[in-house]
Every structure is written in C-alpha cells, then in structure tokens.
Amino acid sequence: GQSDLTIERELDASQALIDSLNEHGVDLGEITRNLESEGVVKFEDAYNSLLDTIGRKRAQYVDDLKDLAEPVRSAVKKAAEGVIVKRLFEHDPTFWTQDVNAFDEITNRLGWLGLPEKQFAFLPELTAFRKKVEGLGFTNAFVLGMGGSSLAPEVMSLTLTPQAGGIDLQIIDTTNPDEILARLEGVDLTKTLVIVSSKSGGTSETNAALQYFWKLYEDLGINDIGKHFVAITDPGTSLEVMAREKGFSQTFLAPADVGGRYSVFTTFGLVPGAVIGVDLQGLLEKAHMADLRS
C-alpha cells in the first residue's frame, strides 16, 4: 500500500454519510454518551482498585514495622547513654574497639567528620583556581578517576545548578575505547582541562587514561601540555611526583584521613565543583549546618 493524507478528501461525501446514519437508527450522540459514561465507570473502578491495593500494602508494611519498634527504641537509648554522637565526632576509637593496636588505623579514617567546616578556609584557593581556568579560556573539562575520585564530581555535574562561568565537565571512569572516543567527540582539546584524580596515585585505569590524554596533546603538537592538566591526590603519591615532573598546571592534595567514599568535601569533590561553577560556599554552609544538627 501507499500512505497518503486522505482524511481531507471528499469531505462533503463523508458528512453526508454521517448524516445518513440517523436514517438507519444509528444515534452517534447516544453512542458517544454511552461510551463516555462507561469509560468513566471503568476508570473509577480501576482507580479505586489501585487505592485498595495501596491501602493493603501500607497496612502490611506498618504491621511489619511493629517488630522493629523495640529494637529501635533500645538502639536509641543505647546511643544516648553511650554518648555515641559526641564520641564519634571526637574520633574516639573505643567507639569501635578496645584493642589499642587498632586505634591508629581507626583515627586515620575519620577525617570526614566535621570536614565541611574545615574546608571554608580552602574557598579562596578554589575561587582563584576557577578564575585561572576561566582566564585560560577553557570551555571543557574531563575528570580521569575511578570510584570515590570521580563519583562526587559526577553527582555534582548532574544535580547541582552551576553559577555563571562554569564549564562543561565529563567523567572518564572507564577503559572502554568506544566510550572514551564518544566522550571526546566534538571536544576542542586546546580549550580543555584534564583533572587527573587518584587518592592512591597509582590507580591503573586512571594512569592509563592519563597516558592516553597526554598522547592526544602530543599528537596535536602542543608545547605546554602541562597547563591543560591538574592533579588531585594524597600527599607523597606517585601522581604528585609525576605531576611535578610533567609540569602540571596545579596539584591539589587531599587529607589522607578521608576515604574516597567521603571525598565530596575534599579536593576530589571541591576542585571539579569549582570548575563547573558550583556554589561551594552555599554547599559547605548547608553541609556544616547538617553537621551541627547531628
């Protein structure tokens, strides 16, 4: 067959056919009213059935919670009597164990507690870095990182509204060549900042991505490649050394006592946040307020 716009053809004949239906006992008005009333009834029945199902499910879930009431009350009472929140924020290792041999390891993992308040002092440096990025004319940025080193920037780029002056940010947390090529499509590398992010400094996937991106700039014949690269890592890592040797534009060091999953308020989250134009002052204020309320 052949598709064609036929609805506008022979309009007079179509109207005459419709008019003739009454002569054969077909009342289109009545048919329409019946269909409408039946449709409303069916919709109402379906809606009421849905509400009944939700009601039964709710009753079931509420009933299931009864068994949790006493354990929750007991846990809250225990937390209050043990001054748990206070001990946690004081980095008290006895909250977890009485083994003195484990104290150092525990206290070296608690830097995330109260971190937002400490990072207010870092804001001037972040503001200066953002202006530097704008001054260099960068319009795009990549974060090369895995896990905690890239999750915070990804969440920020997807959920927070940037201020004026922010640039587009993409995450490279894969070694899949097709995906990397797709991310690079249409990107002007001469106007691109590459943020190499690794807490350990030795993440193999991140290092592979670094080598690949560095080679891209070499192939473009760019002399001062280092100005396109920034490193984020812990103090004393191989990445810190490499960044210095290769002449990276800047290296940001993160506190060693903050694990990757808590790194949103360390340089791993705040530096990319500055690049894309996140209101870091407002972000830290809200996080600090949450700390105070806890």
Residue ranges and their predicted role:
Residues 45-82, 285-290:
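Terminal amphipathic helices with adjacent charged low-complexity linkers/tails
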Residues 127-293:
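Glycine-rich phosphate-binding loops that contact phosphosugars or nucleotide phosphates
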Residues 63-135:
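Extended, charge-enriched "interface" segments that sit outside catalytic cores
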